[in-house]
């Protein structure tokens, strides 16, 4: 599991952005492992703590886990369920976009309540 700083950096806003990026890469026919390695490389270039999150996810995927299972403990239950079911039905890009929309909607609702 990534350290506390990496998990804090992997916040709702960042996850929403990452899900959109991953979806776009997958829609352009890039494989999931390739897309995650690319995002990890970009994080390394920026010296971002997200490198540890990407490394964790890639490690779990390398051990045969699904993306949803790899995100367990890093993302909300709703996200992991949406992403897992989308991956199971071979519609991962759509599931990632849906997860991003859910995060954005929840954030918008929270902001309107405050």
Model-derived segments and their meaning:
Residues 1-114:
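Catalytic metal-binding core of the metallo-beta-lactamase
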């Amino acid at each position: 599991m990534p350290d506390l700083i990496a998990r804090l950096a992997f916040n709702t806003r960042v996850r929403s952005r990452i899900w959109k990026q991953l979806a776009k890469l997958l829609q352009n026919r890039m494989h999931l492992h390739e897309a995650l390695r690319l995002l990890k490389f970009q994080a390394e270039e920026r010296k971002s703590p997200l490198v540890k999150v990407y490394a964790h996810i890639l490690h779990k995927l390398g051990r045969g886990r699904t993306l949803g299972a790899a995100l367990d403990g890093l993302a909300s239950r709703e996200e992991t369920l949406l992403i897992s079911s989308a991956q199971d039905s071979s519609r991962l890009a759509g599931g990632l976009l849906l997860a991003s929309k859910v995060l954005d909607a929840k954030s918008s609702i929270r902001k309107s309540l405050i």
